Amino acid sequence: KLDDVGNPIRANSEKSHRLGLEVDASISLSKQFIVRPNFTLSSNKNIDLELDSEDHETKDIAYSPSVIFGNILIYSPLDNLHVSWLQKFVGKQFMNNIELSAAKLPDYFVTDLNIAYEIKPKSVFDSITITGLANNILDRKYVSNGYMWDVYPYYYPQAGINFLAGLTLKF
């Protein structure tokens, strides 16, 4: 459908369903090692979707991967020092509701490294935490988002390896 000046009208799906399972855990392997796995399995469907007077039957809902999993491995060699290895996998997804092949975002896997050191001074602050984060340490090239303009895909590629530093002051 078009509006009064010829632009496509965006509309909600009339019938859809989302069904999924999310699981996360925190497992202490020892005083120094903790593992925190998580995963999501889901089915996200538009049912009997009709667009531009065409019936597209049952298709995946846009931007809804059916598989996501992650893991955090935390190593604490000292009570106030934590080194975390973070991994995340996101399954394929589509940028539109009709599963157009040009609208497919491929799955991706990224790995980050986080180091946090906490100081507990005796005055002014309850604690000071210094944090360093290296994102995408394997320097993977991936796309996590984008949009479609008609049948043409436009992507938002993500940064390669990048670094962040932080300082948290607690009173």
Residue locations for each model-derived region?
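Transmembrane beta-barrel outer-membrane domains
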Residues: 4-6, 14-18, 28, 60-66, ...
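Conserved long hydrophobic alpha-helices within structured protein cores
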Residues: 34-36, 103-115, 134-136
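Flexible, surface-exposed loop regions and adjacent strand-edge segments
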Residues: 2-10, 42, 48-60, 100-105, ...
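Hydrophobic, lipid-facing positions within transmembrane beta-strands of outer-membrane proteins
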Residues: 19-23, 67-71, 109-115, 161-167
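Short regulatory "switch" loops immediately downstream of catalytic or recognition motifs
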Residues: 45-50, 115-121
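C-terminal beta-signal and adjacent terminal beta-strands/loops
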Residues: 92-94, 117-171
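Gram-negative outer-membrane beta-barrel transporters
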Residues: 11-97
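Outer-envelope beta-barrel architecture signal
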Residues: 31-33, 67, 79-81, 109-111, ...
